[in-house]
Structure formats: structure tokens, C-alpha cells
């Protein structure tokens, strides 16, 4: 079978390529180029992926997606911050770029499947229904970022690392294969944000500085001024610059009115949330059902009740109040170890009975 591997130059995708080659598949490597061709020196994804491909004796391609990445990912990222939301660009990138444009490019190059270094597992029923399941390595599980995959796309992807129990095992494999990136560190940052400094990136590249406004308490009292709503996210405690008898947290961001609303810790908790752009890998059998959900990547799933609404929306009520429900982030639904689907959080539900 001919399999294209999305090669980032890191350990995970390199081991994925090596494992598939060892299994006897015909492998081609594809590296997505999101930035200028000048960004291809030693240590860059393009360079390191090419070195690994040469080591494995496989063909390596560069896929120029600089324009598409800016239009689909960076511009949306900026727009979401302008509107007072906190986006998750990695979820959107997986949907439109990795398992959209890259998947199509792999097929154009004659590949039967696309493999990535994601930590996730898939399974298939006798009737052909595909399932996305959490990885054996729960600490590295990345299914949160993959909830937008459809049945059609799941049929065309493979995750070779899904059954590997630890990152140490992956590095051991990298050494066994003699990969030149075996000791390369993991990337923890959004790829287009230098040093993970969102504020500097937005102000230096996106003209989001200088839009000052008020910081107000939930009781309406004016507490101070801020230098732009893009500097804040729901649940934030540090960096508010406000003296108060108790710790204060960001409770609401109203970008249109240039308001940052803060309150004591109880005000950060929500009874539920509303979400839009909801999609399902496995369609729910009824309009209301019990599930578990995650509202951020590193959060543990919590029990909830989901109610489907018109227009691809849903309402979610938690069994126990949850802290820092953040518009712009994704809510992802699980049944045991299976991903059902997910959507984009648009609002927190703070009180019982709130629509």
C-alpha cells in the first residue's frame, strides 16, 4: 500500500514513517510549508524532515501552503481575538489543512492513505463504520484536536503511534531506526507564534495594540483600565493589575464595548455552555443524551448532558459546575474511549434554566 506521511521533522512523524516502511508499505513524505522558503535551514521542519526521509530512503515532497495557511488559520486566529474570543488554531488547522489540503495532496500523489504522528487510534465495524478512539498513551492523547474528522476522512488516515504506550517507547524506536531526530524535543507551541507570546504577535503583526478600555467588576464597579481585550482570556488571574480584597479572575470579555469583566472565583464557574459548528463522527441517536466532554486539551473529561439544537448547535449542561468555559475553544464529546464529535464554544451558561 502507498502511504503518504505528514512529516514535520519531529520524532513522532519520523517514527510513524519508519514503522510503516518497516511494515512493507511504499512511503512518501510530505512536509507542509507554512512560511517563506527562506525558513528551511538546519533545525527547521523542512530541513529535518528531508534529512529523515533521506535516512529512510523515501521520497520527500514540500507542499507550499503559505497562502492557504494565512487565509484559513492565521486570519481566523486574528479575527477571533478581535471579537473577544480565544481561538484554538490547531483544531482548525487539522480540519482544513492537515486533513483537508494535505489529505487531498496525498491522494493526488497516488497515496492510498495519509499517516500522521498524532496520538490517536481508529477502529472499524463490520459494516464499515469508523471510530476515533483515545490513544494508548493517555498523557499524549490528541483526539481533542481531531474531533472534526468525518467518516470519509477517517477512512483515509492512519495513526501509527496510537497503540504505543509512552513517549519513551517512541524515542526507543527512533534510536532503533537510527533516526537523526531521535533526541529532538517536542514542540509545545502554536507553530506561528514565536515563544508562545500571543500578545506580542498580535500587537506586532496584527495591529491589535492601543485599543484601551475599562476593567469592571461583575457588580458594575469600575476597577481600572486595560490595553486591549486580546491580552485576556476567561479564567485569567495574573496580570490584571488590580488591588482587591480577594483574587479576581476574568469572567467575561466584551470586545465590542472594549470591556473586561472580572469577579471572584465563584463567578468563573459555569453550569454549561452553548456551541456551534457542531459535527459528529458518530451521529447521536437522539436529541438529548449523556456523554463526557472536554473544554480544553489538557482538561479531564467531565460528565454532561447534551441537547441538540437547530443549525448545527447544541447546549451542554455539566453534572458539576466547570471553571473557565472559554468562547472560541472547542468542546469535544466522548463515550468511554470514543470521540463522538465536537464544536466551537460560543457562550457559557452561568445559571440553571438559562437558554
Swiss-Prot record:
Residues the entry annotates as binding ATP: 6-13, 32, 117
Pfam families listed in its UniProt record: tRNA_Me_trans, tRNA_Me_trans_C, tRNA_Me_trans_M
Region (Interaction with tRNA): 140-142, 296-297
Residue pairs linked by disulfide bridges in the UniProt entry: 93-191
Subcellular location, principal: cytoplasm
EC number assigned by the record: 2.8.1.13
Alphabetized UniProt keyword annotations: ATP-binding, Cytoplasm, Disulfide bond, Nucleotide-binding, RNA-binding, Transferase, tRNA processing, tRNA-binding
Gene Ontology MF terms: ATP binding; tRNA binding; tRNA-uridine 2-sulfurtransferase activity
Organism superkingdom: Bacteria
GO cellular component: cytoplasm
Protein's cellular compartments: Cytoplasm
EC class: transferase
Entry's Gene Ontology BP terms: tRNA wobble position uridine thiolation
Active site: 93 (nucleophile), 191 (cysteine persulfide intermediate)
Substrates-to-products reaction catalysed: S-sulfanyl-L-cysteinyl-[protein] + uridine(34) in tRNA + AH2 + ATP = 2-thiouridine(34) in tRNA + L-cysteinyl-[protein] + A + AMP + diphosphate + H(+)
NCBIfam families attached to this UniProt entry: PRK00143.1, trmU
Function field: Catalyzes the 2-thiolation of uridine at the wobble position (U34) of tRNA, leading to the formation of s(2)U34.
Protein family per UniProt: Belongs to the MnmA/TRMU family.
Protein name: tRNA-specific 2-thiouridylase MnmA
Source organism: Pelobacter propionicus (strain DSM 2379 / NBRC 103807 / OttBd1)
Amino acid at each position: 500500500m502507498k502511504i503518504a506521511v505528514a512529516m514535520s521533522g519531529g520524532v513522532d512523524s519520523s517514527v510513524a514513517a519508519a514503522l510503516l516502511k518497516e511494515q512493507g508499505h511504499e512511503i512518501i513524505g510530505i512536509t507542509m510549508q507554512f512560511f517563506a522558503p527562506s525558513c528551511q535551514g538546519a533545525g527547521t521542519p523542512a530541513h529535518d524532515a528531508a534529512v529523515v526521509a533521506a535516512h529512510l530512503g523515501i521520497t520527500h515532497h514540500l507542499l507550499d501552503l503559505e497562502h492557504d495557511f494565512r487565509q484559513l488559520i492565521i486570519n481566523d486566529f486574528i479575527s477571533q481575538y478581535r471579537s473577544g474570543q480565544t481561538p484554538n488554531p490547531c483544531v482548525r488547522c487539522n480540519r482544513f489543512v492537515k486533513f483537508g489540503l494535505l489529505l487531498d495532496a496525498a491522494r493526488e500523489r497516488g497515496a492510498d492513505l495519509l499517516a500522521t504522528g498524532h496520538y490517536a487510534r481508529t477502529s472499524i465495524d463490520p459494516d464499515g463504520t469508523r471510530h476515533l478512539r483515545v490513544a494508548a498513551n493517555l498523557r499524549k492523547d490528541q483526539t481533542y484536536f481531531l474531533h472534526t474528522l468525518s467518516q470519509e476522512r477517517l477512512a483515509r488516515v492512519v495513526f501509527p503511534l496510537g497503540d504505543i504506550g509512552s513517549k519513551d517507547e517512541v524515542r526507543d524506536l527512533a534510536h532503533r531506526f537510527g533516526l537523526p531526530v531521535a533526541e529532538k524535543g517536542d514542540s509545545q507551541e502554536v507553530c506561528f507564534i514565536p515563544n508562545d507570546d500571543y500578545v506580542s504577535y498580535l500587537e506586532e503583526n496584527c495591529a491589535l495594540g492601543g485599543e484601551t478600555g475599562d476593567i469592571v467588576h461583575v457588580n458594575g464597579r469600575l476597577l481600572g483600565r486595560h490595553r486591549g481585550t486580546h491580552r485576556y482570556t476567561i479564567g485569567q488571574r495574573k496580570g490584571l493589575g488590580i488591588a482587591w480584597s480577594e483574587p479576581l479572575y476574568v469572567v467575561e470579555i466584551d470586545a465590542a464595548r472594549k470591556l473586561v469583566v472580572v469577579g471572584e472565583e465563584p463567578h468563573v464557574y459555569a453550569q454549561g455552555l452553548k456551541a456551534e459548528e457542531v459535527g459528529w463522527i458518530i451521529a447521536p441517536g437522539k436529541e438529548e443524551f449523556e456523554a463526557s466532554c472536554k473544554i480544553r486539551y489538557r482538561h479531564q473529561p467531565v460528565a454532561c448532558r447534551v441537547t441538540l439544537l437547530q443549525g448545527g448547535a447544541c447546549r451542554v449542561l455539566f453534572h458539576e459546575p466547570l471553571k473557565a468555559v472559554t468562547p472560541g475553544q472547542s468542546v469535544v464529546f466522548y463515550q468511554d474511549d470514543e470521540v463522538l464529535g465536537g464544536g466551537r464554544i460560543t457562550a457559557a451558561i452561568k445559571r440553571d434554566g438559562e437558554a
